[in-house]
UniProtKB/Swiss-Prot annotation:
One of its GO terms (biological process) is regulation of DNA-templated transcription. GO terms for molecular function: DNA binding. Gene3D superfamilies: 1.10.10.200, 3.30.70.980. This is Probable transcriptional regulatory protein CMM_1817. GO terms for cellular component: cytosol.
Length: 255
């Protein structure tokens, strides 16, 4: 590869990274605004806002942006924040089920963009309920390994608070619980002196589909296209990626 083409490739990749960083910031800000609108600006009584702010800070969103988002969402700046949460259902390659969660101020725009991204990237839209039945809402909390020596240490801290299970995912321990137990589990971690990276309510698949490398690449292409949409907040799929396939995907990212 010539020096010029290598620089052009590097510059292109940086532009993509910068664009996705900006989109990530915008989505985090939107979460803060909605949390503040629903529960108010006082974080002592709004755990959803606490989580939204914490996630934004860990992603390096500037504090001024966070403060403005809290005030704007709570109506303290005279602006009206009016977002709707809409869920779209579809299938990626090889029948992998997909839920696309949008937070939008324009339902028609969101629907059109999701449909277009689906059709252009190998996906198909599904009827309401035909995919969602396979997903359950769960509280999902990620604890980095350097915060707790073992899985048993994490489980001991959160079991009485309502945690259902703890799974070791290599770099993090993942705690699952009912959404209504999220606050109690977070507090139990804090009381045990254990910090966490993220705490979110997610749609967790009950049944997963193991995928090969070709299918995984196709699914990732569709997920990337969806993540580029401004109205899309979260994407959930039921693909199960074996370790060797994940290693190959990681190699793809480094090229």
């Amino acid at each position: 590869m010539s020096g010029h083409s290598k620089w052009a490739t590097t510059k292109h990749k940086k532009a993509i990274i910068d664009s996705r960083r900006a989109k990530s910031f915008a989505k985090l800000i939107k979460n803060i605004e909605v949390a503040a609108k629903i529960g108010g600006a006082d974080m002592s009584g709004n755990p959803t806002l606490v989580d939204a702010v914490q996630k934004a800070k860990k992603t390096s969103v500037p504090n001024d942006n966070i403060d403005r988002a809290v005030k704007r969402g709570a109506g303290l700046l005279g602006e009206v924040v009016d977002y709707q949460t809409i869920m779209y259902e579809g299938y990626a390659a090889s029948g992998v089920a997909m839920l696309v969660e949008c937070l939008t101020d324009n339902k028609n725009r969101a629907a059109a963009e999701v449909r277009t991204a689906m059709s252009r990237n190998g996906g198909t839209m599904a009827d309401p309920g035909s995919v969602a039945y396979n997903f359950h809402r769960k509280g999902v909390i990620a604890v980095p390994h350097d915060e707790a020596p073992t899985e048993d240490d994490v489980l001991a801290a959160v079991l009485d608070a309502g945690a259902e299970d703890v799974t070791d995912h290599g770099e993090v321990f993942e705690i699952r619980c009912e959404p209504s137990d999220m606050v109690a589990v977070r507090q139990a971690l804090q009381e045990a002196g254990i910090d966490y990276d993220s705490a979110d309510v997610e749609f967790v698949p009950q049944v997963k589909v193991e995928v090969d490398l070709e299918t995984a690449r196709k699914v990732n292409k569709l997920v990337d296209a969806m993540e580029d949409l401004d109205d899309v907040q979260n994407i959930y799929v039921n693909s199960d990626v074996p370790a060797d396939v994940q290693a190959a995907l990681d190699d793809d990212d480094e090229e």
